């Protein structure tokens, strides 16, 4: 234990003298140290009363010593306390009270006629000095003249509120201001009563009330409930209940005549969003924002136009959402091209720029269209009436039969072909397709089967006919030569095919063997050259400093071929071979 420790039990309270505060602490004996530890254990177990500070508050015995011990510069007497751990009053912020507020209005009646000590020497105001005065410097200041002393400035107090004071909506409210509204309503009520009394006096003087009282309906109690007199008497109630229908609660109905509230017990047919589709894989419902963006009936196969609710995503395509998205896209594109525009920073500038851009774009399209029409023509096709008018009702009378044939009126026009008609090229006298033979189309004038051929006339017909005769004669001779049976013909064909296959196999074997050997030799030569180049490259790299060598990751990693393995074996050095020294010679 250090010599600075003091027994809290034996320590006497400090009297406040300097001699007591400057005494050196006495060294604790072993017995005192043991008693102190036992007392601490008893306090922790609750068998002994806890320590008490100067304010009479109990000190928790479980607080560590490095927290509960008082520094020497705060209290040299070492009295048990936790005051040094609490917020110090001199460091606490002083907040304004709830009754304090800024001054409202300026007192204009008080006028100062005499210079006051400590005021501005130039104008005479008490709220500033001469160097801070904003008034024009006078030739002789107010300190010496004592005239034209300026009024004091309206200086507002510096208020500093806490968290709740800053958020108090009624802070600075004067309840006396509400009395003005009460007085105004009282005056209106008094004016209504005077007007009503004046009206009754006029009716009594004119005799209307006497006539109504002597009427037979009034005597037998058959007066109409909506008579003029009842309306006049209930005018005040009507004024009070004028806006009753506008402020009634949902599900309630306010009867202004009987002054009762009637519950509207109707059946609510609306369905909650999350109950429209109970499938957990359907549209997601966010309970925090009460939003369901997707359509809950998307998987049910229902048309969104026929459903009462199809999700909240329609809000994204209503109002100015689409135009704002187009403006944002234009801002991004303009910023990429060097224009300093931003949707949030300069919305007005961006809107004007976007409008001018659209006007210039339309003008450019019109100019481009006009230039194309001037160069190539075709304005008459653009001036044609729209398709709606072309297919509209006409005055032509047409009568049809049950089967769709025209009985009376304009007959149906013949459908035109999509191919060119009556177009004769290359001196042909007939069109292409006028002649057909053996599944082929041609020209009738020369019997030619080539579409873009030149016409040969009758000579072409004769040449075609002679070729056909020669072909037919040769086939006839072959047929007359050997009248063989089908079995013999089939056997001959098989023999010829076998001979051809044998010849092909022999030719393939001889050619393939020689070709394979040549290819292998070429591949091996290439692999040997590549291996020599690799060895030279390795030799160069080994001569370079280890830190300056390139990375191995730049080389391709693949499985080597047979030729590359053979070249590696042929070029590999074998130190165990006795003839290895003669390989380099």
From Swiss-Prot:
A zinc finger (CCHC-type) spans 118-135. The modification N-acetylserine is found at residue 2. The keyword Hydrolase does not apply. Residues 20-44, 517-529, 556-577 have a biased composition (Basic and acidic residues). Residues 235-248 have a biased composition (Acidic residues). It comes from the Eukaryota. The modification Phosphoserine is found at residues 215, 227, 235. A motif (Bipartite nuclear localization signal) lies at residues 129-169. Residues 1-102, 206-254, 496-529, 547-585 are annotated as: Disordered. InterPro entries: Slu7_dom, Splicing_factor_SLU7. Keywords: Acetylation, Cytoplasm, Isopeptide bond, Metal-binding, mRNA processing, mRNA splicing, Nucleus, Phosphoprotein, Spliceosome, Ubl conjugation, Zinc, Zinc-finger. Residues 498-509 have a biased composition (Basic residues). GO terms for cellular component: catalytic step 2 spliceosome; cytoplasm; cytosol; nuclear speck; nucleus; small nuclear ribonucleoprotein complex; spliceosomal complex. It is found in: Nucleus; Nucleus speckle; Cytoplasm. There is a cross-link at residues 349, 408 (Glycyl lysine isopeptide (Lys-Gly) (interchain with G-Cter in SUMO2)). Its main location: nucleus. One of its GO terms (biological process) is RNA splicing, via transesterification reactions. One of its GO terms (molecular function) is pre-mRNA 3'-splice site binding. PANTHER family: PRE-MRNA-SPLICING FACTOR SLU7, STEP II SPLICING FACTOR SLU7. Required for pre-mRNA splicing as component of the spliceosome. Participates in the second catalytic step of pre-mRNA splicing, when the free hydroxyl group of exon I attacks the 3'-splice site to generate spliced mRNA and the excised lariat intron. Required for holding exon 1 properly in the spliceosome and for correct AG identification when more than one possible AG exists in 3'-splicing site region. May be involved in the activation of proximal AG. Probably also involved in alternative splicing regulation. Component of pre-catalytic, catalytic and post-catalytic spliceosomes. Associates with the spliceosome prior to recognition of the 3'-splice site for step II, probably during catalysis of step I. Belongs to the SLU7 family. The CCHC-type zinc finger is required to retain the protein within the nucleus and prevent its shuttle back to the cytoplasm via the CRM1 pathway. This is Pre-mRNA-splicing factor SLU7. The gene is Slu7.
């Amino acid at each position: 234990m250090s010599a600075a420790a003091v027994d809290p039990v034996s320590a006497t309270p400090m009297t406040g003298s300097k001699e007591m505060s400057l005494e050196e602490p006495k060294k604790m004996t072993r017995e005192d140290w043991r008693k102190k530890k036992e007392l601490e254990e008893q306090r922790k177990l609750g068998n002994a009363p806890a320590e008490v500070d100067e304010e009479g508050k109990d000190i928790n015995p479980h607080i560590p010593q490095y927290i509960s011990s008082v520094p020497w510069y705060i209290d040299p007497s070492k009295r048990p306390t936790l005051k040094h751990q609490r917020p110090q009053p001199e460091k606490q912020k002083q907040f304004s009270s709830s009754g304090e507020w800024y001054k409202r209005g300026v007192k204009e009646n008080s006028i100062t006629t005499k210079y006051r000590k400590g005021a501005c020497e130039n104008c005479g105001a008490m709220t500033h000095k001469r160097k801070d005065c904003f008034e024009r410097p006078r030739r002789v200041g107010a300190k010496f003249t004592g005239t034209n002393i300026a009024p004091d400035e309206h200086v507002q107090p510096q208020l500093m509120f806490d968290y709740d004071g800053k958020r108090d909506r009624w802070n600075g409210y004067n309840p006396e201001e509400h009395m003005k509204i009460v007085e105004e309503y009282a005056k209106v009520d008094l004016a209504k009563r005077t007007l009503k009394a004046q009206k009754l006096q006029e009716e009594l003087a004119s005799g209307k009330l006497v006539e109504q009282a002597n009427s037979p309906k009034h005597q037998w109690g058959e007066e109409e409930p909506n008579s003029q007199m009842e309306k006049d008497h209930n005018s005040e109630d009507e004024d009070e209940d004028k806006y009753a229908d506008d402020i009634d609660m949902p599900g309630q109905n306010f009867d202004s005549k009987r002054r009762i509230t009637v519950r509207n017990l109707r059946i609510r047919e609306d369905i909650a969003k999350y109950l429209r589709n109970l499938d957990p894989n359907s549209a997601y419902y966010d309970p925090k924002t009460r939003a369901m963006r997707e359509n809950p009936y998307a998987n049910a196969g229902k048309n969104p136009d026929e459903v009462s609710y199809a999700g909240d995503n329609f809000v994204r395509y209503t109002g100015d959402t689409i135009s704002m998205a187009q403006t944002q896209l234009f801002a991004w594109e303009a910023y990429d091209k060097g224009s300093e525009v931003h949707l949030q920073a300069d919305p007005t500038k961006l809107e004007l720029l976007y409008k001018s851009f659209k006007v210039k774009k339309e003008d450019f399209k019109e100019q481009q269209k006009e230039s194309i029409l001037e160069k190539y023509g075709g304005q008459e096709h653009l001036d044609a009436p729209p398709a709606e008018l072309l297919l509209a009702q006409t005055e032509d009378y047409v009568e049809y039969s049950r089967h769709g044939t025209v009985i009376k009126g304009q007959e149906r026009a013949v459908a035109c072909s999509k191919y060119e008609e009556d177009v004769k090229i290359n001196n042909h006298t007939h069109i292409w397709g006028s002649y057909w033979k053996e599944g082929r189309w041609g020209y009738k004038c020369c019997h030619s089967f080539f579409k873009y051929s030149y016409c040969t006339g009758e000579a072409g017909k004769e040449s075609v006919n002679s070729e056909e005769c020669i072909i037919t004669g040769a086939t006839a001779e072959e047929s007359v030569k050997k009248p063989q049976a089908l079995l013999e013909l089939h056997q001959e064909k098989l023999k010829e095919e076998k001979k051809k296959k044998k010849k092909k196999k022999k030719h393939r074997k001889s050619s393939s063997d020689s070709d394979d050997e040549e290819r292998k030799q070429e591949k091996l030569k290439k692999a040997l050259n590549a291996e020599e180049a690799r060895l030279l490259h390795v030799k160069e790299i080994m001569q370079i400093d280890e830190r300056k060598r390139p990375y191995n990751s730049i080389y391709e990693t693949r499985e080597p071929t047979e030729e590359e393995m053979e070249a590696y074996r042929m070029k590999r050095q074998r130190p165990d071979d006795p003839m290895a020294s003669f390989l380099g010679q």
